[in-house]
C-alpha cells in the first residue's frame, strides 16, 4: 500500500469522530478513500504503529486503519 492508492474499508470499523455523525457511532465499512500516509517512522526512527495506514475520505475526514481492514481498489 502506497500513498495515493485508492482503498475500501472491508471490515467493520466504528468511529465517533465522523463530521456528519459527531459523538454517535458510525461504521466505516464500505467507504472508499485515499491513503494519505503509511506510518513506519517518526523523527527518523522506526516505529511499530498499531494502526499504520492513514486514509483520507471526503469532507476533511481521516482515520487510521490496520492493513487488513482495507483493500486496494483496482482502477
Swiss-Prot record:
Chain spans, region Interaction with ferredoxin: 43-46
Database matches in SUPFAM superfamilies: Electron transport accessory proteins
A GO biological-process term: photosynthesis
Gene3D superfamilies (UniProt xref): 2.30.30.50
InterPro entries (UniProt xref): Elect_transpt_acc-like_dom_sf, Fd_thioredoxin_Rdtase_alpha, FTRV
Pfam families, per the entry: FeThRed_A (PF02941)
Keywords: Oxidoreductase
Role: Variable subunit of the ferredoxin-thioredoxin reductase (FTR), which catalyzes the two-electron reduction of thioredoxins by the electrons provided by reduced ferredoxin.
PANTHER family found in the cross-reference section: FERREDOXIN-THIOREDOXIN REDUCTASE SUBUNIT A1, CHLOROPLASTIC, FERREDOXIN-THIOREDOXIN REDUCTASE, VARIABLE CHAIN
Quaternary data: Heterodimer of subunit A (variable subunit) and subunit B (catalytic subunit). Heterodimeric FTR forms a complex with ferredoxin and thioredoxin.
Protein name: Ferredoxin-thioredoxin reductase, variable chain
Organism whose genome encodes this protein: Synechocystis sp. (strain ATCC 27184 / PCC 6803 / Kazusa)
Phylogenetic lineage: Bacteria, Bacillati, Cyanobacteriota, Cyanophyceae, Synechococcales
Amino acid at each position: 500500500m502506497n500513498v495515493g492508492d485508492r482503498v475500501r474499508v472491508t471490515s467493520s470499523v466504528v468511529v465517533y469522530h465522523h463530521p456528519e455523525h459527531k459523538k454517535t457511532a458510525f461504521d466505516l465499512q464500505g467507504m472508499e478513500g485515499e491513503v494519505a500516509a503509511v506510518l513506519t517512522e517518526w523523527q527518523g526512527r522506526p516505529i511499530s504503529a498499531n494502526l499504520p495506514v492513514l486514509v483520507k475520505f471526503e469532507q476533511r475526514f481521516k482515520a487510521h486503519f490496520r492493513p487488513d481492514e482495507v483493500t486496494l481498489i483496482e482502477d
